[in-house]
């Protein structure tokens, strides 16, 4: 997924240019936004990979809306309890824990992106931006360990907003 890697590289480049004194707030803001978009596209492109018509996958990925991903992420803990019941296997519980962390990180990243894009009163520090990028990378790594599981695929379906 070259696009996701490009977003991560762009975020890092914006946050830490060759000359740190050249870093401006706009660079920090765009770095936060790029980190968020890396994970947004990671999730939507993963869902689109399952679409049978290969040449239409880009259109399928565009069906996802930011607000629906946030809603699905906020609702995920309850959905996981419902789907797993009381007798979850250790492997399913580990997957659920990873997905729970992914959902929390996604919501936090979306809030950070909104702040970076719309809250002009906030000044970002390098450390804050670095933490956003690290959170996005942590989500990326976690997602790659669980993305092919039934629980993850259900989460992706929830992101479309259907019942």
Regions of interest found by a model, annotated:
Residues 1-163:
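Terminal alpha-helical segments
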């Amino acid at each position: 997924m070259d696009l996701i890697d490009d977003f991560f590289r762009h975020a890092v480049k914006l946050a830490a240019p060759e000359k740190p004194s050249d870093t401006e707030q706009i660079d920090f803001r765009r770095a936060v936004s790029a980190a968020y978009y890396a994970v947004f596209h990671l999730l939507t492109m993963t869902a689109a990979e399952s679409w049978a018509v290969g040449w239409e996958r880009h259109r399928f990925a565009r069906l996802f809306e930011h607000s629906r991903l946030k809603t699905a992420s906020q609702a995920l803990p309850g959905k996981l309890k419902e789907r797993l019941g009381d007798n979850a296997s250790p492997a399913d519980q580990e997957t659920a824990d990873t997905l729970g962390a992914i959902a929390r990180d996604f919501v936090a990243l979306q809030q950070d992106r909104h702040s970076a894009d719309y809250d002009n009163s906030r000044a970002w520090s390098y450390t804050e931006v670095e933490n956003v990028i690290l959170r996005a990378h942590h989500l990326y790594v976690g997602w790659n360990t669980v993305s092919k599981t039934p629980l993850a695929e259900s989460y992706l379906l929830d992101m479309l907003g259907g019942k």
